[in-house]
């Protein structure tokens, strides 16, 4: 440790004043820094703990956030957790179908107003209102399952959220997919990160040479200010190859631009979980980020937003596989087809082993059960919560056998 400094959470070093002539305010600051040093982001995302998180927002600003909940306007706020208070952070509404004026879905950006400010090493934090999921567990359990299958996935935990000391109910604390996340889970985090945004149903087809079609769908999440040719040229080149490469050379031409093994693995996990709004979603591709390392043209997927999984226990593993340009051609490649079936089998065995998927549901339920019943702003009743929980547990028990049967049939060449 550097003399005259304190090592805070996530190894951030903050210079300290001289011990001579310390004021009460300085002592309070030192105490808060000590608290921060004792905590890390792993503590915040502890899946077995129900956190208490408090936001303090000017009452007039809060009223505007509720009245204009469809807008992305930032407002100043303080965030407090376990005695650590982050001042002058920025908060705004977030979400698509989950946006509502009652139980706000929120994004907190710690550096928006204060350059370089971090909370437990993080630039931002998502507060998911769990509005459309009566179980409040689909995303949390799904992200844990992605991680169990070796995929980079945002960490999640639960909290009771208070705004101006008024309980808002149960929320998920969600790690934001940003360069900090990438550096923790994939590589050095110096590459190009893009968030897919829904404009119109999109199935992976080539959108032409003009970059505007890609720019409208893939929002920049790193390297702000770099020219469009640098940001979007490689994305255009990838989709061109996907659509125009011949069948005999398709895999060899596309794989240097898109990690096809990782792509197929991602889709297989979604299909096992009966995801209705993912890569093979009902309205086209949805809920993913693209990441490209700084020294490479090869893209990969990052999973986000999994609150529509567990859709139907009998969801076919071939559901909509012929609609997506990328996956349709991947499934025609013998190596990738074999990989798809193998990952589905791996999912089924991981879900069944020691009650793996059901055990994760039990783990999440133990954290939130009582708090959900006391949630004053949730959309669904406690009976609906119980029914959704029972449905998830039935899915966890039955899904592995159904998928293993599908895989065995497909390996025999049967439809």
Where are the language model's segments positioned?
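Bacterial N-terminal signal peptides that target proteins for export
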Residues: 10-24
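Intrinsically disordered, low-complexity segments enriched in serine/proline and basic residues
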Residues: 1-3, 7-13
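Residue-identity detector for glycine
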Residues: 4, 21, 34-37
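Bacterial N-terminal signal peptides
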Residues: 23-33
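Phosphate/dinucleotide-binding and metal-coordinating scaffold of catalytic cores
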Residues: 38-415
